[in-house]
């Protein structure tokens, strides 16, 4: 059992191309932190890669909310980080600790998409601005929260999609988030594979539908 103030919870499903790199970055930049990988039924060898490099490996049914809730149950850190497998912090444990306020209950980092095209810088900037204004973080901004508060709220709930919005809305009632100036770098693969315009339209449509009350189970079919 690792004695640490920070625990990273990483849900995975067929992330063999990313999980090894992400865990290596965490080991280098957050050497005193705990890494928990929760696999939702991968068939590409993700589990074998993760087992070698993480502190705790768990298996559950597929679904980010389900996976992250399970990982949080096993976490020992006072602060939980929820990190996507294709996203890495572009800063060190010491840099984060220096910025983290003792009074902070939750927060998130600035997003930087990995692509070199100007459009990815624009998209990153818009996502960051939206999150700063609404206090609603996207999952790839590495949401962090005090474990005691996360537990008291009941975690991510039992959602098949939009779990990041759900948690943010619960947390912002309690406290404003600390928006870090530190960046996390997230893969632009979805944007590259599906096209920028199509991806933007899909994501904004899904978010708008969720805010209007459409069930996450229904929205999942279009994701």
Please describe what each predicted stretch is.
Residues 1, 169-223:
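Hydrophobic helical membrane-anchoring modules
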Residues 5-7, 34, 166:
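Cell-envelope/extracellular polymer assembly enzymes that use nucleotide-activated donors
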Residues 17-21, 44-52:
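Acidic helix N-cap motif at the loop->helix transition within catalytic regions
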Residues 39-47, 87-88:
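A conserved acidic beta->alpha catalytic loop
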Residues 47-74:
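Conserved donor nucleotide-binding strand/loop of the catalytic core
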Residues 80:
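Short aromatic/hydrophobic "clamp" motif used to bind/position activated sugar donors
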Residues 91-119:
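Conserved donor NDP-sugar-binding/catalytic core segment of glycosyltransferases
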């Amino acid at each position: 059992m690792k004695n640490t103030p920070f625990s990273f919870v990483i849900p995975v499903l067929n992330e063999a191309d990313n999980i090894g790199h992400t865990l290596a970055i965490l080991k280098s930049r957050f050497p005193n932190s705990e890494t928990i990988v929760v696999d939702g039924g991968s068939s590409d060898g993700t589990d074998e890669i993760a087992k070698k490099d993480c502190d705790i490996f768990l298996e559950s049914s597929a679904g980010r909310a389900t996976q992250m809730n399970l990982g949080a149950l096993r976490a020992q850190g006072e602060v939980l980080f929820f990190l996507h497998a294709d996203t890495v912090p572009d800063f060190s444990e010491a840099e984060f600790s220096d910025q983290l306020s003792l009074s902070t209950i939750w927060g998130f980092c600035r997003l930087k998409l990995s692509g070199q095209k100007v459009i990815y810088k624009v998209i990153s900037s818009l996502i960051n601005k939206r999150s700063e204004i609404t206090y609603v973080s996207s999952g790839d901004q590495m949401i962090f929260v005090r474990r005691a508060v996360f537990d008291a709220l009941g975690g991510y709930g039992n959602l098949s999609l939009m779990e990041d919005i759900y948690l943010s809305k619960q947390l912002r009632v309690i406290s404003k988030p600390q928006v870090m100036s530190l960046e996390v770098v997230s893969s632009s693969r979805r944007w590259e594979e599906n096209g920028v315009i199509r991806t933007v339209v899909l994501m904004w449509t899904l978010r708008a539908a969720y805010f209007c009350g459409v069930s996450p189970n229904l929205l999942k079919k279009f994701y």
